[in-house]
């Protein structure tokens, strides 16, 4: 067991709750103590949902452990079915209740209820939230479609051409507490509609158990989020011969590849409009003169597997960034992320320790961090621009406006989210560079704060050398920065200043210098630049 201040994923029953809350006509009975009801806040506070999750907690207390907790479970199951009248029922237990081993799923199935019951066995001490969501979605669909799959195993499915209709697909994987899932679905619906493809079912987001019964009617499945839907897509492919897409349409090139793959799966002729990326401004900017400022920018990427892989491709192939670090907290996606890291000549960071990620960011010295809510905090402490690309996220990353990540418009949103922090960083550096110019007016307002130039100057000096711990030479004597050295260091762009300071101090120790002045800084620059 590990004690931590912050975690990237919750226990697997949170994933099950995400599936239940994303759907309609589905209820989740969770065997859990009163303290585990905190999960409601994730949906009402972060997702800003107008109603509570469809979850009934048994909320047992310490005094209940001396009696028959099984009867407590059955009572709550019966009350939930009578009150909410769901089309299907999920039954599971939280990490705490798992220790009691009441097996609430078996109890529910023995009650003779006249609705489908899906018993969830989610190992809380070896698996995490995304796995729990994936397993819940898989078990729910398998339980509902099992009889249909047995009946249709020998029946050949007619193609959409034979039936004389437009092809139709399922969009699988979007859920609540996913990163921009609501807007991604709208964008993909729009793109597919423009390409003559209809939507059969969107699940789990907005679907009901009766909608899931129509999944086999699709000609193909679109796997939007592999962490959630890949295992389900594999099962549908085995049992109903329904192919599914492997490319996630995040980025201009990925969207083009996605459409080409889907056209091929559906047996459609590839349209010339697929290669037409004029609907996104990202390719245009990448060809413009202004984009030269972005070329070669060092970027560190961390988050869930799907968004990390997409971000690495966009950064490397579409914006001309240099990826200097890549990693994920998703153990299920570790193999794919490692393969992508190898192609970039890197070693992937697979961890759920945010402090380890922060240390890796320090070592890589990037100019931009693409990560989760936690990397935003880490980057702020390190003075590095950051854009959030993945869950876990805070409420500010669930905008009320239309802000997808997928498709053509998603590429525009990504362009804005990634480039603006770098442009604001350039502005801050220019203000600092020309601060001592006689034409510079120090009192003007800027985006850096209501105190104008004075705030920025104070910020620059306070984040300079004085607050950093003294570095000791091998002989045990400290290395001091002179005022001249500090002045020269302040002229260096803030996004590489930390690396320059470390290299200069390393050079000073090797050269036996006790003080670092402007000349030492220039000597160090020449030494490491050679």
From Swiss-Prot:
It catalyses: chlorophyllide a + oxidized 2[4Fe-4S]-[ferredoxin] + 2 ADP + 2 phosphate = protochlorophyllide a + reduced 2[4Fe-4S]-[ferredoxin] + 2 ATP + 2 H2O. One of its GO terms (molecular function) is 4 iron, 4 sulfur cluster binding. [4Fe-4S] cluster binds at residue 36. Binds 1 [4Fe-4S] cluster per heterodimer. The cluster is bound at the heterodimer interface by residues from both subunits. Keywords: 4Fe-4S, ATP-binding, Chlorophyll biosynthesis, Iron, Iron-sulfur, Metal-binding, Nucleotide-binding, Oxidoreductase, Photosynthesis. Its EC number is 1.3.7.7. InterPro entries: ChlB/BchB/BchZ, LI-POR_suB-like_C, Nase/OxRdtase_comp1, P-CP_red_C, Protochl_reductB, Protochlorophyllide_Rdtase. This is Light-independent protochlorophyllide reductase subunit B. It comes from Prochlorococcus marinus (strain SARG / CCMP1375 / SS120). The lineage of its organism: Bacteria, Bacillati, Cyanobacteriota, Cyanophyceae, Synechococcales.
């Amino acid at each position: 067991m590990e004690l931590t201040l912050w975690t990237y994923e919750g226990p697997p029953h949170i994933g099950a709750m995400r599936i239940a809350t994303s759907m309609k006509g589905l209820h989740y009975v969770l065997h859990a103590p009163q303290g585990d009801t905190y999960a409601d806040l994730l949906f009402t506070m972060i997702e800003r949902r107008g109603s509570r999750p469809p979850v009934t907690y048994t909320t047992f207390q310490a005094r209940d452990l001396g009696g028959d907790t099984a009867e407590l479970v059955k009572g709550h199951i019966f009350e939930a079915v009578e009150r909410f009248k769901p089309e299907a029922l999920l039954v599971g237990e939280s990490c705490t209740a798992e220790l009691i081993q009441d097996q609430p799923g078996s109890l529910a199935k023995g009650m003779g209820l006249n609705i489908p019951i899906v018993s969830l066995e989610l190992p809380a001490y070896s698996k995490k939230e995304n796995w729990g969501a994936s397993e819940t979605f898989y078990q729910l669909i398998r339980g509902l479609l099992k009889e249909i799959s047995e009946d249709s195993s020998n029946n050949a499915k007619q193609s959409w051409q034979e039936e004389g209709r437009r092809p139709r697909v399922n969009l699988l994987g979007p859920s609540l507490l996913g990163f921009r899932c609501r807007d991604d679905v709208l964008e993909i619906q729009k793109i597919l509609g423009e390409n003559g493809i209809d939507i059969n079912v969107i699940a789990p987001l907005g679907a009901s158990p009766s909608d899931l019964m129509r999944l086999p009617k699709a000609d193909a499945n679109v796997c939007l989020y592999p962490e959630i839907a890949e295992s389900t897509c594999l099962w549908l492919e085995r049992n109903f011969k329904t192919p599914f897409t492997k490319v996630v349409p995040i980025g201009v090139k990925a969207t083009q590849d996605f459409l080409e793959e889907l056209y091929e799966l559906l047996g459609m002729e590839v349209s010339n409009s697929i290669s037409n990326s004029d609907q996104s401004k990202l390719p245009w900017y990448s060809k413009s003169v202004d984009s030269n400022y972005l070329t070669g920018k060092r970027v560190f990427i961390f988050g869930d597997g799907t968004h990390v892989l997409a971000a690495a491709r966009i950064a490397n192939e579409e914006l001309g960034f240099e990826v200097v670090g890549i990693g994920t907290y998703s153990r299920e996606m570790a193999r794919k992320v490692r393969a992508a890291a190898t192609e970039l000549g890197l070693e992937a960071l697979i961890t759920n320790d945010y402090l380890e990620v922060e240390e890796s960011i320090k070592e890589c010295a990037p100019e931009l961090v693409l990560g989760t809510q936690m990397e935003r905090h880490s980057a702020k402490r390190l003075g590095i621009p950051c854009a959030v690309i993945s869950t876990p996220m805070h409420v500010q990353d669930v905008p009320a406006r239309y802000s997808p990540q997928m498709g053509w418009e998603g590429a525009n949103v990504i362009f804005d989210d990634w480039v603006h922090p770098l442009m604001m960083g350039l502005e801050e550096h220019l203000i600092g560079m020309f601060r001592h110019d006689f034409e510079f007016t120090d009192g003007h307002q800027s985006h850096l704060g209501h105190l104008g130039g004075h705030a920025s100057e104070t910020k620059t000096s306070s984040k300079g050398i004085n607050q950093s711990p003294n570095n000791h030479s091998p002989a045990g004597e400290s290395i001091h920065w002179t005022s001249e050295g500090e002045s020269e260091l302040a002229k260096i762009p803030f996004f590489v200043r930390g690396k320059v300071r470390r290299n200069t101090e390393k050079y000073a120790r090797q050269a036996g210098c006790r003080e670092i002045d402007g000349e030492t800084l220039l000597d160090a620059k020449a030494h490491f630049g050679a």
